[in-house]
């Protein structure tokens, strides 16, 4: 067999060798992608989250190793673990906790065109340290037998003398209330926010609650006329997520969205010591996307980053106009908010 002069045997051998080498490189790259694993530390605890992580793994070949615990405990754990932490992604509820983790140097900045597109600017950290994934609203629950729901149009109304002996509040340790106060300080100024807090504490009728769910029960049972809670607690009860008895109680109360409404977030960032930051960012992009984010929000009866979603229980609550306050500014104001609450008698 004779070869043309232009394609000598040694050249064919070299081409074949290069082809094998290139093919091996591609296979090695694919194998590496398929063997990737990221550690996710999450303050959330819902089975539907695990289903979303599985969906992400099937789509990308990146495995997710999940650790769930309380938010503050996760922050302290990563601090202790230092450079040896297996965490690549940290998921936390509330802007104040995200800011706390950022201040502790736990996040690394990330740049992502899709996150800039999918996450509104006021719901992400300006340097890309963390990004909002879901929204929740601090709403007013009303017992219509005790209080006319239409008498409440804003958070400021709760400080009016007309509500003396009617108001129930969660205690000062609640990060949700701390962020609400920070929000009002940004919107209305420290002086007005201080007067508002003092007016509300003068109206409190029951000992301060440690959680939102028992507060909703108290309003439904007539122990309070009004109370402040996160929207998803009411939606969860309406959907029967905490039992038939709570579902009946939730149907007794009316929900008022103050105009404008304080919006907080669940968010996530890439951990500074992440072993696989690129894959970690891909997960956050997936969770913030319209498809992934919808499931992440509905798991806890929260709102997606844009719009109001299709959650039946949330639809029953109605719609709201967000106040547009920056979650980053709100988180940074946390210590000042706690001090203002303490000075105003919020126990």
What are these regions (language model features)?
Residues 1-37:
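Short, low-complexity disordered leader/linker segments with a strong preference
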Residues 29-39, 57-60, 160-162:
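Immediate post-signal peptide segment of exported/extracytoplasmic ligand-binding proteins
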Residues 43, 47-50, 69-73, 85-223, ...:
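Extracytoplasmic ligand-binding site segments that recognize negatively charged/polar headgroups
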Residues 43-63:
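Short, polar/charged alpha-helical segment
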Residues 136, 165-173, 197-201, 206-209, 247-272, 286-310:
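Periplasmic-binding protein-like
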Residues 139-146, 264-276, 295-296:
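A bilobed periplasmic-binding-protein/Venus flytrap-type ligand-binding module shared by bacterial periplasmic
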Residues 191, 302-347:
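An extracytoplasmic/periplasmic, membrane-proximal ligand-sensing/linker region
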């Amino acid at each position: 067999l004779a070869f043309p002069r232009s394609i000598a045997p040694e050249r064919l051998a070299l081409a074949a060798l290069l082809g094998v080498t290139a093919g091996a490189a591609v296979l090695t790259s694919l194998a590496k992608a398929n063997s990737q694993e990221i550690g996710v530390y999450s303050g959330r605890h819902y089975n539907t989250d695990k289903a979303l992580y599985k969906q992400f793994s099937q789509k990308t070949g990146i495995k997710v190793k999940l650790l769930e615990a309380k938010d503050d405990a996760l922050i302290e754990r990563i601090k202790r673990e230092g450079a040896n932490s297996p965490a690549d992604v940290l998921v936390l509820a509330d802007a104040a906790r995200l800011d706390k983790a950022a201040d502790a140097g736990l996040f690394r900045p990330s740049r992502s065109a899709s996150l800039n597109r999918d996450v509104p600017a006021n719901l992400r950290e300006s340097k890309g340290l963390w990004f909002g994934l879901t929204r929740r609203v601090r709403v007013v629950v009303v017992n219509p037998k005790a209080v006319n729901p239409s008498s409440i149009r804003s958070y400021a109304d709760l400080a009016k003398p007309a509500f003396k002996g009617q108001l129930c509040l969660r205690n000062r340790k609640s990060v949700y209330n701390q962020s609400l106060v920070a929000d009002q300080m940004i919107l209305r100024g420290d002086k007005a926010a201080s007067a508002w807090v003092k007016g509300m504490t003068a109206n409190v009728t029951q000992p301060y609650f440690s959680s939102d769910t028992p507060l909703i029960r108290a309003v439904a049972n007539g122990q309070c006329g009004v109370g402040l809670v996160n929207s998803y607690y009411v939606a969860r009860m309406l959907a029967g997520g905490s039992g038939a008895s709570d579902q009946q109680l939730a149907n007794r109360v009316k929900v008022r969205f103050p105009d404008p409404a304080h919006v907080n977030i669940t968010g996530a960032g890439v951990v500074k010591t992440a072993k696989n930051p690129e894959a970690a960012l891909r997960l956050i992009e997936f969770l913030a996307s319209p498809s992934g984010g919808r499931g992440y929000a509905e798991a806890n009866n929260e709102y997606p980053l844009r719009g109001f979603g299709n959650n039946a229980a949330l639809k029953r609550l109605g719609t709201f106009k967000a106040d547009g306050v920056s979650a980053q500014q709100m988180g940074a104001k946390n210590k000042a908010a706690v001090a203002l609450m303490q000075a105003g008698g919020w126990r």
